[in-house]
Amino acid sequence: MAATSTAAVDQLAADLGNTSLDNKAAAPAPIDTSAVPEAQAEGAEAAPTPTAAPHPQASASLYVGELDPSVTEAMLFELFSQIGSVASIRVCRDAVTRRSLGYAYVNYNTTADGEKALEELNYTLIKGRPCRIMWSQRDPALRKTGAGNIFIKNLDAAIDNKALHDTFAAFGNILSCKVAQDEHGNSKGYGFVHYETDEAASQAIKHVNGMLLNEKKVYVGHHIPKKDRQSKFEEMKANFTNVYVKNINNEVTDEEFRELFAKFGEVTSSSLARDQEGKSRGFGFVNFTTHEAAAQAVDELNGKDFRGQDLYVGRAQKKHEREEELRKSYEAARLEKANKYQGVNLYIKNLGDDVDDDKLRAMFSEYGPITSAKVMRDSLIEGSEEKDEKDKENKKEGETKEEEQNEGSEKKTEKKGDRKLGKSKGFGFVCFSNPDDATKAVTEMNQRMVDGKPLYVALAQRKDVRKSQLEASIQARNQLRMQQAAAQAGMPQQYMQAPVYYAGQQPGFMPAPGGRGVPFPQGGIVPGVQGGRPGQYPYQQGGRGGVPPQQMPPMGYPINQFGPGAFPPNTPQYMAAMGQVGALGGGRGGPAGRGPQGIPAGIPQGLQGGPAVPGYPPAGRPQNGGGRGTPRGNANFMAAGRGASPIPGAPADLSAGSFLQAQLATTQDPQAQKQIIGENLFPKIQAIQPALAGKITGMLLEMDNAELINLFEDDNALNVKVQEALAVYDEYLKTQGQQPTQQPAEANGEQPKAEEQKPEEQKA
């Protein structure tokens, strides 16, 4: 039986000898992998194909790799559910950015479904990219042993993952197969095949190494880990025999070049590089039989004058090795430069447009000697300037030709001077000679008002350092948010698990094992589900939205922690609903007295009867001897009798700027942050300029968030900004031929009309 099996493998290898994997060329008949020895053919059942061999593990978990970043759990569920019942799907994502890492895990209920998916769906195109499927191996030691893993190089560019898999599947069960690709999806010419056993890997190396695949001779060998390759490479470097020589006189012949090195030992080969015309390129190579001879030649000839030129003689290096050494030298120089300016280089932003290098230096010169000061500017586009210049010259019709030429030359001179300084980017750098001076400048200049703008001054940091700090802060904030949400939902933190995709459910969080763990919200609620149409959302009946136990709401609509149909605080729907509460009757017998039947829809259960925010008493409790209900007609219940805050909903013991910063910390979306600032800024501007509050708010929102937060602390600065916005708007109205807003209102007759209506309103 063993002899028959060996003969079958030899026959497969012979068939591989003329295999062509190029789709364009006419390929011979495919290899018949279903052939089995006669001894096995007499059995009751035939053995399964290598790729469909049953996995020894009882788990039915598959690893799906090489995925496009835009692939979601829903796309994978639609594909893998065609094979059988899917238990769960999870696309692995970055903990901070939530971007896909390019791989996922698919769990089936039975191992048979997993084997079928591995057989039929491997290398299936998903979003234009073939996926790679293998059994999930949770033990990292088994994944990294390298047993059964082979390396193939010199592959043709037409060979992809599937073609490589089909070629090597004849020798045994393949766990994983991959052709290395660049960022554009092109083959790098090498790949890896991981067999289940070492015997299968040895058979593949024995029969395929040195054979032609797509008319290219391939190399197949055992995979050597990078650590072992590095140690072997260091050993080769220490025992080099090949020498590189440059700075050679162009008149030196091959014989003279060889004789120069022959005195140090036996030379196996020597060569001078020449161009197409046969002229020397000034460098060459010499290979010795022993390392000692090569080392002696390097020691004695390096820097020696030969035919009027100093030679460079050193160990011959490959291109990737030279690039690596060059990269290391650049990295060392960069780190040395960064360490040199550590603690003395300051970053300043929120600068005015009129601040140049000299003015920036003058601002910080009082704190100590400055080595350099630079304001970053945009580069000017010459094409736009030349076009403007031509337009101006075409308008001068009454001037003489000489005058036009003279003026044109003068303007060109001015334009050339202007091109040296582009528009300021609003930030710059100041480098001190002493770290103590830099620290003092940061302490005294940070948040100082200069030209109506608060400066931001801090120590300059490299981009990678800033990115790592930002990721760490975002991750810590997300973790704190998850803990707070878990505490509100009454779920222990140890039951918090990563989001997965369940069959028959929507994306959410895995239920806690052995309990009824309640998932926590993911940053939003179902807006107005109770008032929606029947069947608008899953599990909705009779126009009332609900989620059955242990199930998840639709993607993008997490469970509403404020109650069914409720709105979160600080939204227009929330404020409108609270206004309805103020209009309800108060007292023990009023509609808002005891039960939630008198509360309008959209109010969180925790806020029925009063606001449940920090700094306010619990909802529904009597305050200062008052009744249980909300006073009748009190629409502005948040400020009545409790000490109004500059921002509605802010605690009395917290400043407006601090409260706003706390709100902005809940989101990283710039558009959402602007919306939060606008909602809080509009009431303050409306008190100053009611008629144009909306326009002025929109104009001020173009400012930096840090500057806007300062406006909440300084009413005078806010008034100045409002007046500046009004002035800009008046200039715009003048250009449109309309009446400015700052003119008296009596001119159009509106104010007298309003005064005439006042007595009537009072009588009514």
Swiss-Prot record:
Q: Which residues form the PABC domain?
A: 657-734
Q: Ranges for the RRM domain?
A: 60-138, 148-225, 241-318, 344-462
Compartments, record wording: Cytoplasm; Nucleus
Comp. bias regions, Polar residues: 735-745
Single Gene Ontology MF annotation: mRNA 3'-UTR binding
- Name the residues that span the membrane: none
Q: List GO terms (cellular component aspect).
A: cytoplasmic stress granule; cytosol; nucleus; ribonucleoprotein complex
Region (Disordered), start-end ranges: 36-56, 375-420, 587-634, 735-764
GO annotations under biological process?
mRNA processing; mRNA transport; regulation of translation
Compositionally biased spans, kind Basic and acidic residues: 387-399, 408-420, 752-764
**Keywords per UniProt:** Cytoplasm, mRNA processing, mRNA transport, Nucleus, Repeat, RNA-binding, Translation regulation, Transport
Amino acid composition bias (Gly residues), ranges on this chain? 587-596
Q: Which InterPro entries match?
A: Nucleotide-bd_a/b_plait_sf, PABP-dom, PABP_1234, PABP_HYD_C, PABP_RRM1, RBD_domain_sf, RRM2_I_PABPs, RRM_dom
| Bias (Low complexity) ranges | 597-613
Its name, as the record gives it, is Polyadenylate-binding protein, cytoplasmic and nuclear
